Amino acid sequence: NIGNRTKKGKPLLNITACNYSEPISKLRKYWSELSYLIQSERDNKKTALSEYKAKINSHQRNQEYLIPKLHYRVSGISKRYLNKKNKPKIAIFREQGVNGHKEMANAFNLAGFDCYDLNTNDVIANPELLNEYHGLVACGGFSYGDVLGAGRGWANKIKYNHDALNSLSKFFSDKNKFTLGVCNGCQMLSNLKSIIPGSEHWPKFIKNNSNQFEARQVLVKIPKSNSMLFKDMHKSILPIIVSHGEGKISTKNNSSIKKAIM
């Protein structure tokens, strides 16, 4: 037995052999203090303090946001698509430095799609290639090492190639097709707003306030959405990994954020 539930609802560490008992929150405060002091000197003092407070007060959070919840049956949604003979074709779009394409292909394969590897060079060589696909997903990673900014080098490669620009512009304008950008792919698409209908209020992605690359697990709650990708998933709380050096959104005003949500 490594632990028991307490009536007080506060996690405690008890070591009977040496008659030691302390709240976990107190021990975590001791454990996290040195990291906080180092971060305060190295990074942004405000973000360092914010993270420190979140850690030592984690036991006071609303429990709803600590436990992942599914408000839909995964098998119930995917079964009707997985059994189809003619699966929709999706392009797993990548560029030099992108590293999340294999996991993305596997995810879409499990969701009932027929996945195809597509590099930007393929579109440049054959602009008509995109006509074959029902959807396109721009994957995550570090295209061109993010030297020009997150996703910007990838976007510029498309912008400054007439054939690729026209091909993707046509694809984005087709109401019978869809595009998804994840991680670096999302940052890349935010730099192609000029050719994506309905993206006027999309944000820019700029450096994190901490001035550091942030890799964390967070919980997201899915609101009501018109997106087909979130169909029947309303109110679900899912754990996701965020890993960005430029993950802060920048918009003209708060109304732009609301208008950007589908």
What residue ranges belong to the model's regions?
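Residues that mark the start of a beta-strand
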Residues: 87-89, 114, 239
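Cysteine-nucleophile active-site neighborhood
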Residues: 142-227
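Intein/HINT protein-splicing elements and their conserved insertion hotspots or analogous self-processing inserts
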Residues: 1-89, 97
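Short acidic/histidine-rich motifs immediately flanking catalytic phosphotransfer sites
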Residues: 129-137
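Short helix-loop-beta junction
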Residues: 102-117
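Short glycine-/small-residue-rich Rossmann-like dinucleotide-binding loops
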Residues: 95, 140-142
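Amide-donor transfer/coupling interface in amidating biosynthetic enzymes
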Residues: 2, 127-128, 165, 169-170, ...
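Beta-strand->loop->alpha-helix junctions that form or flank phosphate-binding loops
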Residues: 1-21, 116-122, 202-212
